[in-house]
């Protein structure tokens, strides 16, 4: 048995409960929802900015709360492309990373 199948058949697994996410405390969750709703290259921008910001955080060049600031700055600055192609996604990702590194490095 794999993954969730094991829990379904094993009565010793505790029940899972979920609460609504606190989008004020976890701003990136709200930004991710907005990017998903917007579509196009918005998720590529979000991902590139998040990866760059987390990298800077791990290097102790950025505080944890600034990760959301960096992602939001990139989403605001990178022009969105509704026509999602591989090239458009890669370009949006690169632009987002460039913005984060330029602004927060």
Task: Indicate where each model-derived feature is located.
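Catalytic, metal-anchored helix/loop core of enzyme active sites in primary metabolism
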Residues: 4-5, 9-105
């Amino acid at each position: 048995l794999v993954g969730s199948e094991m829990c379904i058949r094993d009565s010793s697994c505790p029940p899972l409960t979920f609460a609504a996410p606190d989008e004020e405390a976890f701003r990136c969750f709200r930004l991710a929802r907005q990017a998903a709703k917007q579509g196009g290259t918005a998720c590529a921008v979000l991902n590139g900015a998040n990866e760059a910001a987390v990298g800077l955080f791990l290097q102790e060049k950025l505080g944890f709360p600034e990760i959301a600031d960096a992602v939001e700055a990139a989403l605001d600055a990178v022009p969105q492309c509704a026509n999602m192609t591989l090239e458009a996604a890669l370009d949006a990702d690169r632009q987002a990373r460039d913005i984060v590194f330029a602004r927060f490095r």
